[in-house]
């Protein structure tokens, strides 16, 4: 049973509240808390000069600022602390604050707890954004007032008073957001699981544990959607508290969705033929099947079919940019893990020129090398992980006694220039980094946009 938002309003009024992080996603939260009568202090590692005009904007509405390298040293004396998702709650500063009586939470935890609308939550290692968007589009097509947020869209907590019980909310949730959750969405999905974010999580087991929070607090009338083709997620059926639907690309599924004789079906009913889908790759068929399971109770087959046959993809996800001198360029900047890059490679019918590399999340690249060596014509590497990826591929190339040209570059501009010089008519060049962007770019969108800008200047 969800709590009425008036309880939160009564709770937060006049409280001393710390908001850690003054990033774009936290700014609406800060302003909303001020509007609700909280005494807000915003904390950030950046100095005033780097924050720019937002520092003055916040001070004008009565927000105190704590800035600079040692900003977390001043967390004492607050009633409530909203932490940014990527910060571990076992940091000494948070532990000390909690021991002193502070309530530590996050925007997403409070949103799910008080949101009056039905909440669809999507997590997993790969396919989250596409599946979130598919669910959103299907619900919208059916006529529901639908909101989308979490890792995509806009921060939703500040809009919670506009939401009603007959509205729908679709959230993409990361392991960081889920780590401290003690509340779960009514309809939850885990797309798949493979090692990821091991630069933040202690190990893969903790990463999986965090993902499970998406269904751990469900009730008996809630729904969990699981990938039958993924051993880890398939076994989670035993831990489910409510109903379970599964999806599969390789097995017949009667209680869920599957691909059968090239037809996408849900609960035995045909939705569409795979040849009529705009999205490239079998991984996107899996994303569609997962979405069908999530919306099955709320959306007609006609609405599912419309979205499945008309949706052409999300920006930065195997996105076709242009063809230059017979060479096709694709932007798959969202691919921040080896498994996501491998899925992208599998969507092409011939080996490609791959541009990869970036920030090191401490995850292995051997699975990418072993599964992708025969799908890559030339490998162009950049970023912090370039030598790590090179080493993984060289081992496989040596073991398989095959050949592959590997080129090391120092920038995106150089990567595209090298690819353009090497490519022959009929080739495909794709940016699919298998890594996060933080060594060179603030996020994958900026990385993808730079790649597109360079390609469009060719």
Swiss-Prot record:
Pathway: Cell wall biogenesis; peptidoglycan biosynthesis. Keywords: ATP-binding, Cell cycle, Cell division, Cell shape, Cell wall biogenesis/degradation, Cytoplasm, Ligase, Nucleotide-binding, Peptidoglycan synthesis. GO terms for biological process: cell division; cell wall organization; peptidoglycan biosynthetic process; regulation of cell shape. Transmembrane segments: none annotated. It is an enzyme of class 6 (ligase). PANTHER family: UDP-N-ACETYLMURAMOYLALANINE--D-GLUTAMATE LIGASE. This is UDP-N-acetylmuramoylalanine--D-glutamate ligase.
